[in-house]
Regions:
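N-terminal presequence-like segments and the immediate start of the first folded domain
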Residues: 1-97, 102-242, 246-260, 265-383, ...
């Protein structure tokens, strides 16, 4: 039976800061909803005719005088800082979660996650450290295929909480090298950074090693590739959950208190191994979950990366699993969504269910130029989203943030046009990325990661 919660009046508003480039597509630069501020993906464009912002361009006769990633990162982070201020928030003091997306043209997209030898994000990190000086937000940084504006190579989006002070938690696990918070608490909320099955040493300095050189911790490795044994992605996922469980306990939470997991992984052909480890850890009443393939991970050999949102034990904020009438069964062991306090976390939104792809979501072979499949897929998803929102006591107008992962940007314009039809006023903030394909649902052109707002009754 579907759960249903009564509706309450919303205090969600779009933020349009002065002095920051206005998006060229139908989304808001930021959404403020109660204590939460969602910042749309920012990239180094002023959305003018030249695409890349003038501040990020070298003189055409001096193309080697600066590091493009540094210039673009500084431009992006300043715009984010200004957008936060327009929403009454501080990027440094209030940010609790940050996502960073880097174009990685040499990334292995055929079952691995390595972004290619020589790839670095150090210029970005050095710029980030000028803007984020303490209790840095829990972080994810991923290699992706492409961004929407030519020559842009970095995109960043952020979540902030203006109500309660954030605090970085010292965790008894191998320490990340990039200087972010692996565990962060704010009020009743716990955010973990994207974690991996690594000790941040791996084969560095080792004369003997098992299999290809990697940064995977030794107990998360399967036997030598010369033997017929082992499920390498499943084993990494199991060891990763062990680490996350310890992290949550240190933060005053537990795996039972997880409300949403984001799983960044290599390729849909490895999904089944992750799913087996997931079911072992969450046999009943699992949290909401978004699974995103073709991710470039900056720790060689690691697959997957998992980040969690959880609640502190014994806090006032409670969670509730949402299953909506009229919405097909999720693909995999996950609910439609989980409501936690005033936020609604959706599981992977994709244009189908256990019965396959939605009607109209693929052109017939006999009529290869007939139909608008991206429009049909987006409409299918958003009709489901509206039903899930209704079951949670809110409405689709209270969606605050989307991350959209496209197989091919050729379908972007058709899909965003349909998206805009469902949000005629104050559309959610948005981050849109090209990752490649195919996805785990044959014929699907994109997947969405959504967060909604459920105002207090």
């Amino acid at each position: 039976m579907a759960s249903k919660i009564s509706k309450a009046k919303s205090n969600r508003e779009a933020i349009w800061p002065g002095g920051v480039p206005k998006p060229a597509m139908p989304y808001s630069p930021a959404i403020k909803a109660g204590p939460w501020v969602f910042i749309a993906g920012q990239l180094a464009s002023d959305f003018g005719p030249d695409g890349l912002a003038m501040e990020c361009r070298d003189h055409p006769d001096l193309p080697f005088q600066s590091i493009p990633q540094r210039r673009q990162s500084a431009y992006i982070l300043q715009n984010i800082k200004d957008t936060c201020a327009a929403a009454g928030a501080s990027l440094d003091d209030d940010s609790v979660r940050i996502w960073q997306w880097f174009t990685a043209p040499n990334q292995n997209r055929d079952g691995g996650t390595w972004v290619g030898d020589g790839f670095t994000i150090t210029p970005y990190l050095e710029e980030r450290d000028r803007f984020l000086t303490h209790d840095r937000p829990a972080s994810t940084g991923m290699g992706i295929k492409n961004l929407l504006v030519k020559d842009t190579i970095v995109e960043v989006d952020v979540l902030l909480n203006t109500e309660t002070k954030k605090q970085q938690v010292a965790l008894d696990v191998p320490q990340a090298l990039a200087g972010y918070s692996q565990g962060l608490i704010t009020g009743d909320w716990v955010f973990t950074a994207g974690e991996h099955a690594t000790d941040f040493v791996g084969d560095t300095g080792r004369a003997d090693y098992n299999g290809p050189r990697s940064a995977i911790q030794l107990d998360a490795r399967t036997p030598s590739e010369l033997l017929w044994y082992g499920l390498p992605v499943k084993l990494q996922t199991q060891k990763l959950f062990d680490k996350l469980e310890r992290n949550l306990e240190t933060c005053g939470s537990s795996m039972k208190d997880v409300v949403h997991a984001t799983i960044y992984y290599s390729h849909p052909k490895n999904l089944a191994e992750i799913e087996e480890a997931w079911i072992e850890r969450f046999p009943v009443d699992p949290p909401a979950r978004t699974m995103i393939p073709y991710m470039g991970i900056g720790i060689r050999g690691c697959d997957p990366e998992i980040a969690l949102v959880a609640l502190k034990k014994g806090g006032k904020t409670k969670k509730q699993t949402i299953m909506a009438d009229g919405v097909g069964a999720p693909i995999g062991h996950e609910p439609h969504a989980v409501k936690a306090g005033d936020l609604l976390f959706f599981s992977t939104q994709i244009a189908g269910d256990t019965n396959g792809l939605c009607a109209g979501g693929k052109r017939a072979e006999e009529y290869p130029w007939y139909g608008l499949p991206a429009r049909a897929q987006m409409n299918f998803i958003l009709e489901n989203v509206a039903k899930v929102c209704e079951a949670a006591g809110t409405s689709i107008e209270n969606i605050c943030r989307r991350q959209a992962f496209h197989t091919d940007f050729d379908w972007f314009m058709e899909s965003i046009d349909e998206w805009a039809r469902h949000f005629p006023k104050d559309p959610p903030c948005s981050t849109t990325l090209e990752i490649g394909g195919p996805l785990h649902l044959d014929g699907a052109l994109f997947l969405l990661d959504l967060i909604g707002y459920c105002p207090d009754e």
